[in-house]
Structure formats: structure tokens, C-alpha cells
């Protein structure tokens, strides 16, 4: 596991279970590219085949994107392409007055939140929703679709069933 936030819950989980942990705060490096090269090297040295961005709030650069092309998955708190490209997707959904938003799992590309979609689940926007209540329901959807999307991608990468270039995606609950 690699993190840019050593105090996050995932890092604690890894430490408790002796899972290799790369603590790669940007402060340690001269550039984002240097950080991503270190992340690439860390992952490759541990035989990582699939990178899952869960709670990772940085944009990847060429060293990591090139090494793991088609094998980096991100979770985004909206039904992409709506409200992509930033950290305030939940706030945007509430401001816009949409009836539903949701969660998306997609492949990471050099274009922010624009990679092929693997799975989506819609979440209704309730009239009395706050950012916190809507974000909590979106997180619950993310927890459901991320494992399913990872299994789909694993099957593609292993050559079982769904070709790697397939546009097939999982539609979960109302998308």
C-alpha cells in the first residue's frame, strides 16, 4: 500500500497487518513526477499488478501512468462525467439541484476523471440532504461497487471473459 497521508486509516490498517507501506508525501520529493516514480518503484518492487486509488487525492503523472496503464482504478463521488475534475463533486451535486448523483469506479488516464467507467451506482439526492448526509450515502455506494469493479478488471486482465478493451461496465442500482 502507498499513501500520501501517513495518518490515514488505510495506513494504520497496513501497519497493523504488516502490509508493505510506502509513505510518499509530496513534501519528500522535488516534484510530482519524482513522487510517482518512487510510487511506481515501490509497487513494482512488491509485485503489484493493480493500483486502486481509494481516498488518494492527487493527480498521477507519467511515471506511474505509463507503468500501470489500464491498471489504475479510481473511485469518484459522482456519476461521471457529471461533476468530474475536482474535489467538490458532492457540493456541486447539491448546488445543481440534480435528483440523483452517485459513485463511479473508472480507470485512471492522464485526463482527470475521464477514463473508461467500470461501475456506477446512483444515489438519490434528498430534499433535506446536507453535504455530510449525501457524502455518507455516496461512500456506502462506493464500498459496494469498488469490489465488483476490481473483480471485473481482474477478469479482463486475466483474459477471462471480458476483453481488456471492452466498454462493458457494471450498472449497479439505478444508473
Task: Annotate each PLM feature.
Residues 15, 44, 94:
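Anion (oxyanion) recognition and catalysis
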Residues 27-59:
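Short phosphate-binding loop-to-helix
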Residues 21-22, 43, 72, 125:
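Generic signal for short, ordered secondary-structure residues
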Residues 1-38:
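Short, surface-exposed acidic-centric catalytic microdomains
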Residues 50-172:
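Donor/substrate-binding cores of folate-linked one-carbon enzymes
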Amino acid at each position: 500500500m502507498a499513501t500520501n497521508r501517513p495518518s490515514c486509516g488505510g495506513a494504520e490498517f497496513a501497519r497493523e497487518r504488516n502490509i508493505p507501506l510506502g509513505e510518499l508525501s509530496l513534501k519528500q520529493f522535488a516534484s510530482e513526477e519524482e513522487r510517482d516514480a518512487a510510487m511506481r518503484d515501490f509497487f513494482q518492487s512488491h509485485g503489484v499488478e493493480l493500483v486502486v486509488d481509494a481516498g488518494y487525492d492527487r493527480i498521477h503523472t507519467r511515471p506511474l501512468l505509463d507503468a500501470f496503464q489500464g491498471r489504475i482504478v479510481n473511485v469518484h463521488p459522482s456519476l461521471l462525467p457529471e461533476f468530474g475534475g475536482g474535489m467538490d463533486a458532492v457540493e456541486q451535486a447539491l448546488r445543481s439541484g440534480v435528483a440523483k448523483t452517485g459513485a463511479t469506479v473508472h480507470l485512471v488516464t492522464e485526463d482527470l476523471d475521464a477514463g473508461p467507467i467500470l461501475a456506477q451506482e446512483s444515489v438519490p439526492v434528498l430534499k433535506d440532504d446536507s453535504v455530510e448526509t449525501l457524502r455518507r450515502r455516496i461512500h456506502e455506494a462506493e464500498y459496494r461497487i469498488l469490489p465488483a469493479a476490481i473483480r471485473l478488471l481482474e477478469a479482463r486482465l486475466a483474459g477471462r471473459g471480458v476483453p481488456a478493451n471492452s466498454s462493458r461496465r457494471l450498472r449497479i442500482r439505478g444508473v
